[in-house]
Amino acid sequence: MIALEAINVTKVYGTGVNAVTAVNDVSLSVKRGEFIGLVGPSGSGKTTMLAMLAGLLTPSDGQILIAGKDIGRMSEGKRTRFRGKYIGFAFQANNLVPFLTAQENVELLLRLNGKLNRQGRQRTRDLLTRLGLGERLRNRPGQLSGGQQQRVAIARALIHEPEVVLADEPTASLDTERAHQVVQTFADLIHEQNRAGIMVTHDLRMCKYVDRVIQMMDGKVSRTIFDRQAILQLAGSASDLEGVPPSLVAEPASLGL
């Protein structure tokens, strides 16, 4: 079942001679239980695309459907409420509330959705423990390292069991060992909870945990890697997508993108 779909999405900044097209006619879909790696060089449009999928930016053209709802047609108030229920996101600027503990920061999403009860508190503790923060539940953000704060943000993205989970460089502040642990746990939770997940990353080693890799270039989807062997090769030995054999890479047209 498709949880998220982008149809011919374009984002243009500015007007006239100053117009810049950041995303150009991109289509993609993600099924429930599927974890996608979105990669590409700086300026390729991947972060802008993620922000539109999160409902934080409105497309200049095209549609973004989550749970069958076109979020681009919603009023700002309705979209904010929709995001709180259906979308979980962990961006580099994780915006943790400084005077709340790690546990309270994660529980905030449950509180806003009217789901903060004994079961929700236990689920929060279990999730933070699984992310290696079991001994940091009562610490405030200022008492946590950057990597620990990022893991709290990941827990917050998952705790309310959203339809779609989006992450922008979730391992940016983590050492290699912890990065692998966090992304593997992230992927496991997406699969276990049957969510649709997209992770933007510059660290191709993290792609070993995804089900499909989508490359963006100059605002467009340039290629998709769907073969498990190719994904592992990308994550293990290739420095970029050019190192993956063409026979294991699908052009967008062949996938209906």
Give residue ranges: language-model regions.
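ABC family nucleotide-binding domain
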Residues: 2-209, 215-216
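Generic low-complexity segments that are intrinsically disordered, proline-rich and/or Lys/Arg-biased
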Residues: 60, 142, 246-247, 253
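Conserved beta-strand-loop-alpha-helix hinge in the C-terminal portion
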Residues: 220-248, 252
